[in-house]
Amino acid sequence: MRVGPVRFALSGASQPRGPGLLFPAARGTPAKRLLDTDDAGAVAAKCPRLSECSSPPDYLSPPGSPCSPQPPPSTQGTGGSCVSSPGPSRIADYLLLPLAEREHVSRALCIHTGRELRCKEFPIKHYQDKIRPYIQLPSHSNITGIVEVLLGESKAYVFFEKDFGDMHSYVRSRKRLREEEAARLFKQIVSAVAHCHQSAIVLGDLKLRKFVFSTEERTQLRLESLEDTHIIKGEDDALSDKHGCPAYVSPEILNTTGTYSGKAADVWSLGVMLYTLLVGRYPFHDSDPSALFSKIRRGQFCIPEHVSPKARCLIRSLLRREPSERLTAPQILLHPWFEYVLEPGYVDSEIGTSDQIVPEYQEDSDISSFFC
């Protein structure tokens, strides 16, 4: 994956101009610009110039030059401490505007070009683990990549391309999709998941909300939020994690106290996603979590008549109670439904009003407390 440079804040106005500690050149052309800091003296002691370092820092080595961005307006707190007030802040060449609906995520506007990105903030001690999946994955058109990383004293600021809304919100607004559109979008979803699986990464908490539109036309999708994925070793994809969205959880996660196949669980989630795209509601739904999990354990669901036979076949091939009987992500891409629906001359059925729209769930929850 092509990754932009990590830039470390090096100096304030009193420091000499010089290159910062950057990504190795193999990862792209490093940016050699200074960042603002709130304590030039402290930064001078902590941040040696690249020419003073014995060797260039490894991409995932501990940060050698942390310092803070220009802080937002602050007020005096108890004990004389400063408390940041909500609102825009500035770091390097970016104006950060927090998104109310997404914690620790901001719109990032370049003050020179007007380019808009998304900025995620991570604790400096944990940012390496958070961005590791992005680094491990080879470049893919349906998976988001890192544009730039800026390191502060306490936080890492990771910049991504902006998006144009997520799939969950899109399906809620459309009720359900025609099969031709669903096939085009679902093929991109599966392609991203297959690429992750082939690169030793299991998604774990896979859901529609993790896929966002890359363009305003809403024809191109990309997978984002890889921070909570699982990096596996070899062919062993056994997981024991029970963290995720209840609507997408697979039966084996509910039925076992040990481990389960992470890839097979991802495929089950793909089945839930495809059903939701075509029907406009989840295959298993109940406001009571215990009742919901009982339905998932039984694995019984109804596919409406308007769904084509080939689409029904694919859904059933994904939502099998036995994990070993499910298709793999690469096998899904070979299913005849895609060719059938996407071939010229295909006529879709009329869109009707779904009797139940996709509900809002607590998307990021620990489901282990609901287990019997």
UniProtKB/Swiss-Prot annotation:
Biological process per Gene Ontology, one example term: regulation of MAP kinase activity
CDD domains found in the cross-reference section: PK_TRB1 (cd14023)
TM annotation in the entry: none
InterPro entries hit by this protein: Kinase-like_dom_sf (IPR011009), Prot_kinase_dom (IPR000719), TRB1_pseudokinase_dom (IPR024105), Tribbles/Ser_Thr_kinase_40 (IPR024104)
Compositionally biased spans, kind Pro residues: 59-74
Motif (COP1-binding) on chain: 355-360
Cystines in this chain: none
GO cellular component: cytoplasm; nucleus
Pfam families, per database record: Pkinase
Region of interest (Disordered), residue spans: 1-26, 49-85
Keywords: Protein kinase inhibitor
The keyword Transmembrane helix appears for this protein: no
Domain Protein kinase: 91-338
GO molecular function ontology, one term from the record: ubiquitin protein ligase binding
Domain notes: The COP1-binding motif (355-360) is required for regulation activity. The C-terminus (351-372) is required for interaction with COP1.
Subunit details: Monomer. Interacts (via protein kinase domain) with CEBPA. Interacts with COP1.
Function: Adapter protein involved in protein degradation by interacting with COP1 ubiquitin ligase. Promotes CEBPA degradation and inhibits its function. Controls macrophage, eosinophil and neutrophil differentiation via the COP1-binding domain. Regulates myeloid cell differentiation by altering the expression of CEBPA in a COP1-dependent manner. Interacts with MAPK kinases and regulates activation of MAP kinases, but has no kinase activity.
Family affiliation: Belongs to the protein kinase superfamily. CAMK Ser/Thr protein kinase family. Tribbles subfamily.
UniProt-recorded name of the protein: Tribbles homolog 1
Record organism: Mus musculus
